[in-house]
């Protein structure tokens, strides 16, 4: 599966339970000015293409499009990754935040193995 850039309106629909179907999503928040976000980009795409994750939806949201998103979802800084379990029927989504790494990668912040382990634990 590929990564889809998501709008604030679509993100709001997922979070509020206004999605067309219940789904599990992996959501990366990034900024165009963040060098670590740019370095993580290809790895995130590669993870999304893994057959193991074929039933998951991978999204990316540019925080430059809505600077208030960090406060509304209670995270600080990018890149940031969530697993989101969306529901239907106006039932709010369940969000799980990938914790900041104890030993961050100096180029990408997160390590690929940590992202995969997080997805395996929270989404599969």
Locations of regions flagged by a protein language model:
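Structural micro-motif
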Residues: 67, 73-85
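Non-catalytic, surface beta->alpha helical segment in thiol-disulfide oxidoreductase systems
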Residues: 83-124
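Short cysteine clusters
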Residues: 34-37
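A short beta-strand-turn-helix
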Residues: 4-24
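Short, solvent-exposed loop/turn segments that connect beta-strands within catalytic domains
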Residues: 19-23, 54, 87-94
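Beta-strand elements of modular eukaryotic interaction domains
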Residues: 15-18, 48-49, 68-73
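Thiol-based oxidoreductase modules, predominantly thioredoxin-like and allied folds used
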Residues: 4-8, 29-31, 41, 45-68, ...
């Amino acid at each position: 599966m590929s990564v889809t850039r998501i709008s604030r309106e679509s993100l709001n629909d997922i979070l509020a339970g206004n999605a067309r179907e219940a789904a599990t999503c992996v959501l990366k928040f990034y900024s165009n000015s963040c060098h670590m976000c740019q370095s993580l980009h290809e790895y995130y795409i590669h993870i999304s293409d893994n057959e193991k994750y074929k039933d998951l939806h991978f999204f990316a949201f540019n925080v430059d499009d809505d600077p208030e998103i960090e406060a509304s979802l209670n995270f600080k800084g990018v890149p940031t990754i969530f697993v989101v379990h969306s529901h239907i029927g106006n039932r709010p989504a369940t969000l799980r935040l990938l914790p900041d790494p104890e030993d961050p990668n100096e180029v990408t912040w997160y390590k690929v193995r940590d992202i995969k382990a997080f997805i395996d634990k929270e989404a599969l």
